[in-house]
């Protein structure tokens, strides 16, 4: 059972990320994808982030029990924001292990997305009119991509993985904790935090109430599930926050797998017949098989590629 003071800290961390999104001076009705709105929100979230990097460790140090007291310094370092620093180890500076953990987590994600990754490669190899550099320019070099692929993964993982998990670990006796609690209770805070998008959609008036409700429920569900993944990674890698950030960023980039881009190009944009059409049809079947294979392999890759024995957070 959570102590009330611990619950208040967890609630504060969750709410403190959402509140700055609405504490803007933008005109009423300004949409979330308006560049001015994005800049204003990122500025205010940055201020809140810097404040919480000191406030949350301070609260943890003040509220931790006398039998398992944690200092402000240890609470701050335990957030995992310093690359290569493993706070729980006798020799905390382990940069080679840090790089190894990052590499293994990326390999795990590439296995999950093996279908879309191979489809991307084949599309650019077999379509002479395509340009990776042009795709990169249009996809990444703008403020929306900076928010989605860099700013959001960093800030959300610091708030909803690092700060929430370390609050559990530092304020609740480990004898009263289970890994299931660590993986799913903080993830629920992360999922519910996305409910505010329903308010934005209502303000825009572009969707029906039923559509907003269904979309919000689905968003809460998949963000809670994704939160469980990043909490698992944080624990298994001994508090390597940057593994969680990289995974979050890559998942935002990849998104939910859609139809094969190669198949769409050669069946809709530049329709081919004969042998090429048959080969594209075969690839399309292979693509969907790889999607299923990547999902099935996730359980095994999580166990084999995430973390190293001796570096994990133990209860």
UniProtKB/Swiss-Prot annotation:
The chain crosses the membrane at residues 4-23, 45-65, 75-95, 106-126, 149-169, 209-229, 238-258, 276-296. The keyword Protein transport does not apply. It catalyses: Hydrolyzes the peptide bond -P2-(S-farnesyl or geranylgeranyl)C-P1'-P2'-P3'-COOH where P1' and P2' are amino acids with aliphatic sidechains and P3' is any C-terminal residue. Its EC number is 3.4.26.1. GO terms for biological process: CAAX-box protein processing; peptide mating pheromone maturation involved in positive regulation of conjugation with cellular fusion; response to pheromone. Its main location: endoplasmic reticulum. The record marks 248, 252 as: Transition state stabilizer. Residues 1-3, 66-74, 127-148, 230-237, 297-315 are lumenal. One of its GO terms (molecular function) is metalloendopeptidase activity. InterPro entries: Rce1 (IPR039731), Rce1/LyrA-like_dom (IPR003675). It is found in: Endoplasmic reticulum membrane. One of its GO terms (cellular component) is endoplasmic reticulum membrane. Keywords: Endoplasmic reticulum, Hydrolase, Membrane, Pheromone response, Protease, Transmembrane, Transmembrane helix. The active site is at residues 156, 194. Residues 24-44, 96-105, 170-208, 259-275 are cytoplasmic. It is a multi-pass membrane protein. It is an enzyme of class 3 (hydrolase). The keyword Chaperone does not apply. Belongs to the peptidase U48 family. Protease involved in the processing of a variety of prenylated proteins containing the C-terminal CAAX motif, where C is a cysteine modified with an isoprenoid lipid, A is an aliphatic amino acid and X is any C-terminal amino acid. Proteolytically removes the C-terminal three residues of farnesylated proteins, leaving the prenylated cysteine as the new C-terminus. Target proteins include the a-factor mating pheromone and RAS. Its substrate specificity is overlapping but distinct with that of STE24. This is CAAX prenyl protease 2. The gene is RCE1.
